[in-house]
Amino acid sequence: DTIQFCRYAKMVSDLGANVILEVQKPLVRLLKDLTGVSTLIAKGDPLPEFDFHCPMLSLPLAFKTDLNSIPSAKSYLEAEAERVAYWKNRIKGDGIKIGIAWQGSHGTKIDIGRSFELKLFKNIADLNNVQLISLQKGYGSEQLRNMPQGMQVMDLGEELDADGAFLDSAAVITNLDLVITSDTALAHLAGALGIKTWVALKFVPEWRWMLDRQDSPWYPSLKLYRQEKMDEWASVFDQMQIDINSIPYGSI
């Protein structure tokens, strides 16, 4: 939610306010250069004096946001330049570089039905000129040790985001041609970075993805692939494979 709605800080700033933005401590470095923010503090740290307060997720209501007025900039976050350069060298190689993630936060109610198994990427991994790179952290990453025979996915290991939430993920994503992910924070991160991203959605997704549309008014760089039937992912990945095959090499 923070990555999606921190964009409203600029709108508040444009009204003439000095914006003090309080976010989860792990996100402070990621958001340190966010446009419109005068002071960025970690949740729980002492607050400076302020005149007004508004919960971040109430800002869409405060600005009377509707479908036609969603602030949908091409991008509003930027990865650290040194990390971008480091990961560019780390993942260098031929082919279309596709970052993948398949598992959301385990054991939470929101995760029911939204995650899928890594092995569903097998047919995409087998395509010519495709290099899959894992963006998965924590639970779910153990599937990298038990992939179908012949399936290759680059594992970035414990080094990824060792210094803070999403710092390396943002840098890796900046170097990718495409991200394919389940409905996780990585979808929001890639969208906020303006990187071409395909999101696989369960049959009844979260409210923010709406219904009956392939685009997202929140993130212009996203394309949504929806389940046709509950708990059925095969058709989603079949369509992705078709779409990748239809992309001329070098034009993604």
PLM regions with names:
Residues 2-252:
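Catalytic machinery of carbohydrate-active enzymes
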